[in-house]
């Protein structure tokens, strides 16, 4: 064991320390702490930077072939129950810690420019720090109980960050929606976790899987019960990774500041669901029915997210549905047995999607100079256009991210997405077709986003269009003088974009099919040997890769004809296919259905319960009080102090008892 492993616990603890110091400062010395803005930012950055350095050290050690290391202490004991808490360092935790810390560090650097004039600047850094700590704690957890603790902490931090601007109604509603939706999945995870412990007597990932299969094979528990436990556990990742049908919270979460969209919705929180599926693979893999549920859930989500993203006009919401779709690819990969492919896409997606979200924040930052600090105007792509000449760094990095997510070689997204599609074709051609069609839609809506934002003429000064958008959003037109041209963002915002562009281009080369170093690292030696037996077939690679690139190029061409060359009118297409257009624009009406069935239904039930509470429960309580009051008022006259009166009462009581028992 390397000495470095003994200090791995510092990786999640250091960001927690930063959050605690700033939090105590904000509570006890609020004004003074807020004045030290830059100092607090540097303090948090230095701590997350140290965690990143330690994470790279652990990753390098694992690459060199060191064995996994687990350190635990007995946290609680009751009879045969012993709960261990500690940390584990293996291939998966080392890889995830590097992803989380690198993206978190770059997001924190970016935040200094994006949130420079926000009065909650210091509080935001505290939230970022505790969120990073929670995610890292989840990554290093050695058992399911500890995962669940940090899982809930991640959810709490998400609530705080999405609702950071709590004085805005939309943000307050969005964080509540995210919190409640995730509670549904978390309750399923809790039930599944308890069910697995009841069956196997363990919270250890490997032990749970082995014991569960032994119990099923010996007939001690039914296979149906094992399926139920596995699906219940999967409900947690369904909510956290915004999978159908618990996906509705993710687009609303864009109400939070853009750096959070990059951190939560690209590299960390939404990836936590895929990470948990990977951790629980010993439980899921031997249960074909559970794997089918996982695969079809992922495929449905990928297709659903892509179809909704086709018509989005808000740049951040378009990226949100894109994230939902890409997470669907990862989950589908896990369900068809593509453990390595799913993790590979998680890694590549984390970097290029973080860059895309930060790029959208840079665009919004520039647009606010022209249209003001109104999200309706600053985030609407219909008011953008021609930004490439004003914001060349942002445009170039956004184009790199767009090419990566579209799966154009040699960018990172091509290698990971192509591997998933290849495995899907072997497992189930229907799943492959869904993934293939989704790839075409991805290319279309991402280049639609790029062309609307960065190409053509700048539309931000069109007052009539501004008034039209504000009226549609139910807001009154604003008056005020703004600039006439957007500007490039400061270095603190463009540097993270340029840094993320490097892995967005190059990191996919770790997983090329003729020398898959990523697969060799993530797999155990036996699994790597099995994978090597299949070898690399050039013809198969060219056919599968050609298909995925071909559909992407078709999507790009259609987007170019519609939004760059204006040869196809999108409005006429919308009129020609109104049902499909409205279905996409209204997000398949999921929000409306959930609102009418669950929200309004719950409110109606609550009103009925209120009536019962008011008339029955309160009535019984009030009646008891009134009866007590009246009896007290009546009995107080008995206490008059005269002995002969007390004797008369006793005589009457005795006489009454005699008569009663005589009759009886």
UniProtKB/Swiss-Prot annotation:
UniProt keyword annotations, A-Z: Cell membrane, Membrane, NAD, NADP, Plastoquinone, Quinone, Translocase, Transmembrane, Transmembrane helix
InterPro entries linked: NADH_UbQ_OxRdtase_chlpt_su5_C, NADHpl_OxRdtase_5_subgr, ND/Mrp_TM, NU5C-like, Proton_antipo_N
Top EC class, one word: translocase
Annotated catalysed reactions: a plastoquinone + NADH + (n+1) H(+)(in) = a plastoquinol + NAD(+) + n H(+)(out); a plastoquinone + NADPH + (n+1) H(+)(in) = a plastoquinol + NADP(+) + n H(+)(out)
GO biological process, one term: electron transport coupled proton transport
One Gene Ontology molecular-function label: quinone binding
GO cellular component, one term: plasma membrane
Compartment(s) where it occurs, according to its Swiss-Prot or TrEMBL record: Cell membrane
Enzyme Commission number(s) from the entry: 7.1.1.-
Residues annotated as transmembrane: 7-27, 39-59, 91-111, 120-140, 144-164, 187-207, 219-239, 258-278, 290-310, 327-347, 352-372, 395-415, 420-440, 495-515, 541-561, 643-663
Source organism, top-level taxon: Bacteria
One Pfam family, short name: Proton_antipo_C
Transferase found in the keyword field: no
Membrane topology: Multi-pass membrane protein
UniProt cross-references to NCBIfam families, sorted A to Z: NDH_I_L (TIGR01974), PRK06590.1 (NF005141), PRK07376.1 (NF005626)
Family per similarity comment: Belongs to the complex I subunit 5 family.
Function: NDH-1 shuttles electrons from NAD(P)H, via FMN and iron-sulfur (Fe-S) centers, to quinones in the respiratory chain. The immediate electron acceptor for the enzyme in this species is believed to be plastoquinone. Couples the redox reaction to proton translocation (for every two electrons transferred, four hydrogen ions are translocated across the cytoplasmic membrane), and thus conserves the redox energy in a proton gradient.
Protein name: NAD(P)H-quinone oxidoreductase chain 5
